[in-house]
């Protein structure tokens, strides 16, 4: 099986990490995998030597030049599967396959069958209904949903049940174990022994950090030495910083921005908080649980498929700072319970959310789709 993977993002977020884990994992089980990535992107920078890498930067979803370049590569490489990992990737894959097959219905002079298009769906948003979106998603042979919550949304959008398959995302447990811990108290000059509540997410509206800051305002009234470290960058940085100032939390809430040592920072957290309004699955939750950290998270999207309430963490409604603050306070004041939840989270991730399981299930999707196509 030969799969060609497409991710057009320049930034590094959970989705790009999943792409890299998938591609490397497929190669480890003996499959051929190549990657189309943005030439200036963080994903391309992190690719290991030996991987077939094709730089491509579509300017728009219907970038004819990018589509033409990719169509020529399809004719030369003749992959069995094109796995598009983001919406722009779906568009360029659909365009390139259409250009490559033309009126012959094949991608090669010998009449090779055109590749199947697999589309990963990692966000719990509905598919857009404009004409371009309808066209590109009609070209998809199978959707891979990162959670059952996303799969249900795809079915609501009219995707046939046999063309939407859930494959929960996974993490590399060995990589997590190998990450050196970061002493957050020294790094960010936090008071000695101050409990640290951490969040890792882009500063964008649906991640809900504004509600986390509101919760922090309530938490420090009950736990005055508590500190909050929010890792990530995004369009809402100015808004969140202003909110911190309005609540007079400058000594309690820190926004260090994007860091490459995220796993080490998570190991320095006493508690992991996720404030998302919507969430496909939440791979940062998996990282935190793999680091044996108890969780306080919202019930958004696929999060309840990860966090076992009362066992690995506590779940609260989205957009509810009061409930989030109460859950954070409860766990900060219960060292034993917090430790037990962290241990249970580690066991849950080790059993259900490994990269090996994710790769095996992804390979099975490829085999099924390729084997059943006319």
Predicted segments, located by residue:
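Conserved acidic donor-binding segment of nucleotide-sugar-dependent glycosyltransferases
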Residues: 309-310, 314-321, 330-335
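A conserved, positively charged/aromatic
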Residues: 115-146
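Short hydrophobic beta-strand element within catalytic cores of glycosyltransferases
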Residues: 35-37, 294-297, 307
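A conserved mid-protein helix/loop that constitutes part of the nucleotide-sugar donor-binding site
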Residues: 13-24, 195, 199-221, 228, ...
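A short helix/loop element that forms part of the nucleotide-sugar donor recognition site in Leloir-type
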Residues: 176-191, 346
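N-terminal strand-loop element at the rim of the active site
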Residues: 5-65, 235
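A short, active-site helix/loop in glycosyltransferases that binds the activated sugar's phosphate group
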Residues: 140-166, 171-175
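Aromatic "clamp/platform" in nucleotide-sugar-dependent glycosyltransferases that forms part
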Residues: 258, 277
């Amino acid at each position: 099986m030969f799969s060609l993977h497409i991710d057009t993002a320049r930034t590094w977020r959970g989705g790009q990490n999943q792409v890299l884990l998938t591609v490397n994992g497929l190669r480890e089980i003996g499959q051929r995998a190549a990657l189309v990535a943005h030439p200036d992107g963080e994903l391309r920078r992190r690719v290991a030597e030996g991987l077939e890498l094709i730089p491509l930067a579509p300017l728009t979803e219907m970038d004819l030049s990018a589509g033409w370049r990719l169509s020529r590569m399809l004719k030369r490489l003749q992959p069995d599967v094109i796995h598009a990992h983001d919406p722009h990737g779906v568009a360029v894959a659909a365009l390139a396959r259409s250009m490559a097959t033309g009126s012959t219905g094949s991608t090669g002079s010998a009449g090779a069958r055109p590749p199947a298009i697999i589309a990963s769906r990692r966000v719990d948003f509905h598919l857009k209904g404009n004409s371009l979106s309808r066209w590109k998603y009609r070209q998809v042979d199978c959707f891979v949903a990162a959670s059952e919550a996303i799969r249900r949304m795809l079915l609501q959008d009219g995707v046939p049940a046999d063309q939407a398959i859930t494959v929960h995302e996974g993490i590399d447990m060995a990589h997590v174990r190998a990450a050196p811990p970061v002493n957050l108290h020294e790094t960010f000059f936090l008071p000695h022994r101050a409990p640290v509540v951490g969040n890792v997410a882009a500063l964008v509206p649906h991640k809900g950090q504004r509600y986390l800051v509101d919760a922090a305002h309530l938490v420090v009234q009950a736990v005055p030495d508590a500190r909050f470290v929010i890792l990530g960058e995004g369009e809402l940085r100015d808004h969140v910083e202003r909110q911190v100032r309005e609540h007079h939390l400058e000594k309690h809430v820190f926004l260090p921005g994007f860091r490459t040592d995220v796993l080490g920072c998570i190991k320095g957290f006493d508690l992991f908080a996720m404030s998302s309004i919507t969430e496909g699955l939440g791979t940062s939750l998996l990282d935190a649980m793999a680091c044996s950290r108890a969780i306080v998270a919202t019930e958004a999207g696929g999060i309840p498929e990860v966090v076992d309430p009362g066992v690995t963490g506590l779940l609260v409604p989205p957009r509810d700072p009061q409930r989030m603050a109460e859950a954070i306070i409860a766990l900060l004041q219960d060292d034993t319970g917090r430790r037990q939840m962290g241990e249970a989270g580690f066991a849950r991730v080790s059993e259900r959310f490994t990269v090996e399981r994710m790769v095996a299930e992804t390979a099975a999707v490829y085999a099924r789709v390729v084997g059943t196509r006319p």
